[in-house]
C-alpha cells in the first residue's frame, strides 16, 4: 500500500528535442498564449520605441485561461436579486411631539453618501462619481419580490408591515392608543390581491418606493412580463444552426420544464451576438484574434507522415547528395517547433497572421535548407488571389530559393534557357522547356502558390454569424467532405501541385517528384483538416469580418494601414520543411466551444453598457462646463474602464492597446450605434434616464450664501413647543426672490479677488440682507441629522474656498466653487425643567450656506400621514413559484466527434 500511495516524481524534460513521431499536443488556450507571446514580440517593438519617451507600460502577457474563467463567472452573475421584502424607502424620526414626526426619504440619504467629493480640477473623479451613483440606482432597483411575508386577517391575505417599504416601528411607542389603532386599521387594509402575469399567478399589493428605484423596478418587471419568448426562440434556433455548423448538438436539458405553470424564468442575455459591437472596439483586432484562438481552436497533435515515403523516394541510395535527402533525418528543436506552430497559426488565420523569414545568418549560408524551403513553401502557402499567408518579402525569397534549387543540378544536367529580365525563375528548363515564370509570386492572381487557379474563398449557404459568410477552401477542398485519413487524398490533386511535379520532372528531379507524388494524400489530408477547423470550429463572433478580410490583401499590396492590420510572425527557413513533414491533427474539440456563444454575449453586453455610459458622460461637459473645465474625452474613457468588470478590461487590453488609444478612437467608438441587447443594458439605460435629473443624484448648483441666525426660541410654553416638533434646516423650500440675489460667476469672483476686494464685496451684500448665488457648478450634497448644535464647520461653512498667498512680491488668490455642501436638520429637544431662556445665547449663531433642491427629502407630517406614501404597485411571485434564470441554457450541448477521427 505504501508503494501504491507513493507519488511518482514528475519527469522533467531536459532536452529540446522531441520523442517519436508525435511532436506535441496544443490546446486552444495554450496556443492562444503562445500566439499572444509571439504577436506581442512584434507589437511591442513599435510600442517600446514609442514608450521610451513617455511612461512605463506593463508588457506582461496575460493569462488567457483566467480571463475566460472570469468572463464565464460574469455570465453566471445575476444583475438582479431575489428578495422577500423591498428595501425601506421611507423612515421616520421621532420628535417630542405625539402627533408629528419627520419622514425621511432614505433614497436621498443613501445617495448623498455614494461617491467622492466633486472638484473642478479632477474631472475623472467627477465621472467616476456619476457612474457609481448610476450603478447604485440600478443595483437597488433591480429586484424580484418572491414569497413575501403575509398574514390572514378576516379571510383576507394582508401584507406584513416590513413589506410596505415604510419603517415606522420606532414611532409606535410614542403614539397614543387612538393613533396606533388608526395605523393598525390602515395596515389591515394592505390587502394582497391575486393577479396574473404571462399566465402565471402572482400577488399584487400597494407599497412605498422612491421614484428612481421604482423606475428601475418597473422597467425590470416589464422586461419579465414581456416573457422574452420570441428572443428565446430566436436564440435557440440560432444555436441549433451554429451547432449544425460546428458539429455540436444543442442540449435542452435546462429547458426541460421551464414552460410549467409554476415556473417564472428570466432571460438576461440574447443570441446571436451583434458582431459590430465586438469589432467596433478601438484597436481590438489582435485581442479578437487571441479570443478566437482561445475559445475555438481544437487540441491537436503534430503527426509525421509514413517514414517509408522518404525512404523509398529520397534516401533509397547509399549515397545521398540531394538537399531533400540531407534534411530527411533531421529533428526539430524546441525553437524550430515554435516556428511550426506559427506556420499552422498562419494557415488557420489566413490574412490575419502572415509570415516572414527570420534574419538568421547560419541558415542563409546553408543552401540545402533554403532550396528545400523554396520548394515546399510554394506548396504550403497561398500568396495572392484572395488572401495571403506570406509577406511580399518572404514570397520573393522563396522564389529565389526555388530558382536556386531548380538550377542546382546534382544528378544530371538539363537544358536551361534564361529570360531577359533577370528576375527569379525567369527561365525555361528541361527538354520540353517548362516555363518557370509561372511560379514567380503574383499577389494579384495567386500564381505560383496554393491559390493558383483554385477557388479558395467561397460564399454558399448563410452562416450563423452574419459578419463572416466566407468559407475557406485551401487547395480547392470542400470542408463538408468527410475525412478518412487512410484513404482520403488518393487520386486528389490541384493545379499548383500538378505544375510543381511537372516542373520537377522537367528539371531532372525525378526522386523528389516521386516523393511529392507520394506525399500528396498526406498533404491533402492536412489542408482538409485545416479547412474544417477554419470553417467549423473557428467560426465565431471574433472571426474577422468579410469586408476587413477582403481588404487585407489589397491594403498589404498598397501599403495602406487600416483597423485590422495583419500580424507578421518570423519563422526560420528550416521550419518550412518541418511544417511540410507534419500535419496538425485535431484530437479534442476546444473545451470552450459549447459555451463560446455565451461568453461572446456577455462580452458584447458589457461593451454595450460601457458605450452607453460613455455616451452619457460625454454629454455632461456640455451640460455643466464649469465643473468640467479641464475635462478631456480620455477622462470619461478612464472612468468607465475603472468601473467596468476586470475580465472585460482584460479582453479589450489583451495586446496592451489601451496605452495607445487616442481621442479619435474613443469618440468614433462612442458615436457608433451598435449595441447588444441584454437585461443589463436595459436597466443601465433606465438608470441613466433616472439620473438625468442631477438632483436625484444629490448634486446641485443652486447654492446660496446668506447670513441667517440659528433660531433660539423662548420656551414660554414647553408643552406647546414639544407638540410642534420644532426643527431647523438650511435647505430652502423655494429659491430666494430673484431681485435679492446677486449671482457670482467665476469671472466676477476672480476680478474682485484680483482687485483685493472679494471679501469686502461679499460682506456688503450680506449686510444688506441679500443673497449671493454661487451657481454654474455642481456640488456634492450630504444630508445629516443632529439633535444638538451642529459643529461650527457645518454651521459657518462657506459655499466656496478662497485662499490667498504671497510669492515673489506678488499676491495670489485661489477660488474654488466645487466644495462639499451639507444639508443639515437640527431637531430641537427640550425638557420640562428647562427655563424660558435655555436655548438663548448672548451672541447669536449664524449659518452661511443655503441649498435649494426641488425634492422632498424630509417632511414634517402628522401621524395619520405616515402611510400616505403607499402609492406604488408591486408584483410579487408566490412562494410555490420557482424563479429560474435560463441564461445558462444559451450554450450548446455535446460536442460531436469529428467523423473518422
From Swiss-Prot:
Its main location: virion. Keywords: Virion. It comes from the Viruses. Coiled coil: none annotated. The keyword Glycosyltransferase does not apply. The VP3 protein is one of the five proteins (with VP1, VP4, VP6 and VP7) which form the inner capsid of the virus. Belongs to the orbivirus VP3 family. GO terms for molecular function: structural molecule activity. One of its GO terms (cellular component) is virion component. The keyword tRNA processing does not apply. SUPFAM superfamilies: Reovirus inner layer core protein p3. It is found in: Virion. This is Core protein VP3. InterPro entries: Inner_layer_core_VP3_Orbivir, Inner_layer_core_VP3_Reovir.
Amino acid at each position: 500500500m505504501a508503494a501504491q500511495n507513493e507519488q511518482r516524481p514528475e519527469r522533467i524534460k531536459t532536452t529540446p528535442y522531441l520523442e517519436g513521431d508525435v511532436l506535441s499536443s496544443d490546446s486552444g488556450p495554450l496556443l492562444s498564449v503562445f500566439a499572444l507571446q509571439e504577436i506581442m514580440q512584434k507589437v511591442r517593438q513599435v510600442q517600446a520605441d514609442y514608450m521610451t519617451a513617455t511612461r512605463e507600460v506593463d508588457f506582461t502577457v496575460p493569462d488567457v485561461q483566467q480571463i475566460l474563467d472570469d468572463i464565464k463567472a460574469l455570465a453566471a452573475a445575476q444583475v438582479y436579486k431575489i428578495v422577500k421584502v423591498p428595501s425601506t424607502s421611507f423612515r421616520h424620526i421621532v420628535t417630542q411631539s405625539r402627533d408629528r414626526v419627520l419622514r425621511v426619504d432614505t433614497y436621498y440619504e443613501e445617495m448623498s453618501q455614494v461617491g467622492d467629493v466633486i472638484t473642478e480640477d479632477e474631472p475623472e473623479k467627477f465621472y467616476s462619481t456619476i457612474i457609481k451613483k448610476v450603478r447604485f440606482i440600478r443595483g437597488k432597483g433591480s429586484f424580484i419580490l418572491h414569497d413575501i411575508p403575509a398574514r390572514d386577517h378576516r379571510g383576507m391575505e394582508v401584507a406584513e408591515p416590513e413589506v410596505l417599504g415604510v419603517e415606522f416601528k420606532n414611532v409606535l411607542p410614542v403614539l397614543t392608543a387612538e393613533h396606533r389603532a388608526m395605523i393598525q386599521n390602515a395596515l389591515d387594509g394592505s390587502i394582497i390581491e391575486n393577479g396574473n402575469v404571462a399566465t402565471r399567478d402572482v400577488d399584487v399589493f400597494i407599497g412605498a418606493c422612491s421614484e428612481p428605484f421604482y423606475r428601475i423596478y418597473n422597467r425590470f418587471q416589464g422586461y419579465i412580463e414581456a416573457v422574452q419568448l420570441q428572443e428565446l426562440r430566436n436564440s435557440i434556433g440560432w444555436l441549433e444552426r451554429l451547432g449544425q455548423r460546428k458539429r455540436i448538438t444543442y442540449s435542452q436539458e435546462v429547458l426541460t420544464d421551464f414552460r410549467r405553470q409554476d415556473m417564472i424564468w428570466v432571460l438576461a442575455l440574447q443570441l446571436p451576438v451583434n458582431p459590430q459591437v465586438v469589432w467596433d472596439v478601438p484597436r481590438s483586432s489582435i485581442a479578437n484574434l487571441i479570443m478566437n484562438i482561445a475559445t475555438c481552436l481544437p487540441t491537436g497533435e503534430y503527426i509525421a507522415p509514413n517514414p517509408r515515403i522518404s525512404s523509398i523516394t529520397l534516401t533509397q541510395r547509399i549515397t545521398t547528395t540531394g538537399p531533400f535527402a540531407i534534411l530527411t533525418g533531421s529533428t526539430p528543436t524546441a525553437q524550430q517547433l515554435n516556428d511550426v506552430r506559427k506556420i499552422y497559426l498562419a494557415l488557420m488565420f489566413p490574412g490575419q497572421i502572415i509570415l516572414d523569414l527570420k534574419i538568421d545568418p547560419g541558415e542563409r549560408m546553408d543552401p540545402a535548407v533554403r532550396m528545400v524551403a523554396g520548394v515546399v513553401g510554394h506548396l504550403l502557402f497561398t500568396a495572392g488571389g484572395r488572401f495571403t499567408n506570406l509577406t511580399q518579402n518572404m514570397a520573393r525569397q522563396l522564389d529565389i530559393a526555388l530558382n536556386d534549387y531548380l538550377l542546382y543540378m546534382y544528378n544530371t544536367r538539363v537544358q536551361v534557357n534564361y529570360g531577359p529580365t533577370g528576375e527569379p525563375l525567369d527561365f525555361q528548363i528541361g527538354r520540353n522547356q517548362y516555363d518557370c515564370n509561372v511560379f514567380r509570386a503574383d499577389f494579384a492572381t495567386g500564381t505560383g502558390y496554393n491559390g493558383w487557379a483554385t477557388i479558395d474563398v467561397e460564399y454558399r449557404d448563410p452562416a450563423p454569424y452574419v459578419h463572416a459568410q466566407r468559407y475557406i477552401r485551401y487547395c480547392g477542398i470542400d470542408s463538408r467532405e468527410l475525412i478518412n485519413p487512410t484513404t482520403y487524398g488518393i487520386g486528389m490533386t490541384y493545379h499548383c501541385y500538378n505544375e510543381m511535379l511537372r516542373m520537377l520532372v522537367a528539371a531532372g528531379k525525378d526522386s523528389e517528384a516521386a516523393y511529392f507524388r507520394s506525399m500528396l494524400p498526406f498533404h491533402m489530408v492536412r489542408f482538409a483538416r485545416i479547412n474544417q477547423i477554419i470553417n467549423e470550429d473557428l467560426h465565431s463572433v471574433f472571426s474577422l469580418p468579410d469586408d476587413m478580410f477582403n481588404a487585407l490583401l489589397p491594403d498589404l499590396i498598397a501599403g495602406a494601414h487600416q483597423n485590422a492590420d495583419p500580424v507578421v510572425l518570423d519563422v526560420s527557413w528550416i521550419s518550412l520543411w518541418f511544417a511540410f513533414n507534419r500535419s496538425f491533427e485535431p484530437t479534442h474539440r476546444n473545451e470552450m466551444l459549447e459555451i463560446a456563444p455565451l461568453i461572446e454575449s456577455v462580452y458584447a453586453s458589457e461593451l454595450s453598457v460601457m458605450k452607453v455610459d460613455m455616451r452619457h458622460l460625454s454629454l455632461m461637459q456640455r451640460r455643466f462646463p464649469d465643473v468640467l473645465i479641464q475635462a478631456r474625452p480620455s477622462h470619461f474613457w478612464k472612468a468607465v474602464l475603472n468601473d467596468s468588470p476586470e475580465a472585460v478590461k482584460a479582453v479589450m487590453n489583451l495586446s496592451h492597446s489601451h496605452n495607445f488609444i487616442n481621442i479619435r478612437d474613443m469618440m468614433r467608438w462612442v458615436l457608433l450605434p451598435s449595441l447588444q441587447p441584454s437585461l443589463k443594458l436595459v436597466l443601465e439605460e433606465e438608470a441613466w434616464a433616472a439620473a438625468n435629473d442631477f438632483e436625484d443624484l444629490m448634486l446641485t448648483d443652486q447654492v446660496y450664501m446668506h447670513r441667517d441666525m440659528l433660531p433660539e426660541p423662548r420656551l414660554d410654553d414647553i408643552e406647546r413647543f414639544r407638540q410642534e416638533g420644532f426643527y431647523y434646516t438650511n435647505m430652502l423650500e423655494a429659491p430666494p426672490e430673484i431681485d435679492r440675489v446677486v449671482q457670482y460667476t467665476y469671472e466676477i469672483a476672480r476680478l474682485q479677488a484680483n482687485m483685493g476686494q472679494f471679501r469686502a464685496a461679499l460682506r456688503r451684500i450680506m449686510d444688506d440682507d441679500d443673497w449671493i448665488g454661487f451657481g454654474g457648478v455642481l456640488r456634492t450634497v450630504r444630508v445629516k441629522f443632529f439633535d444638538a448644535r451642529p459643529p461650527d464647520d457645518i454651521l459657518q461653512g462657506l459655499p466656496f474656498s478662497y485662499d490667498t498667498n504671497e510669492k515673489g512680491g506678488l499676491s495670489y488668490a485661489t477660488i474654488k466653487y466645487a466644495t462639499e455642501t451639507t444639508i443639515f436638520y437640527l431637531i430641537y429637544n427640550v425638557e420640562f425643567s428647562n427655563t424660558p431662556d435655555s436655548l438663548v445665547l448672548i451672541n447669536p449663531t449664524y449659518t452661511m450656506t443655503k441649498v435649494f433642491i426641488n425634492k422632498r427629502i424630509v417632511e414634517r407630517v402628522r401621524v395619520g400621514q405616515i402611510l400616505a406614501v403607499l402609492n406604488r404597485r408591486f408584483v410579487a411571485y408566490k412562494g410555490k413559484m420557482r424563479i429560474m434564470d435560463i441564461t445558462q441554457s444559451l450554450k450548446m450541448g455535446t460536442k460531436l466527434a469529428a467523423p473518422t477521427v
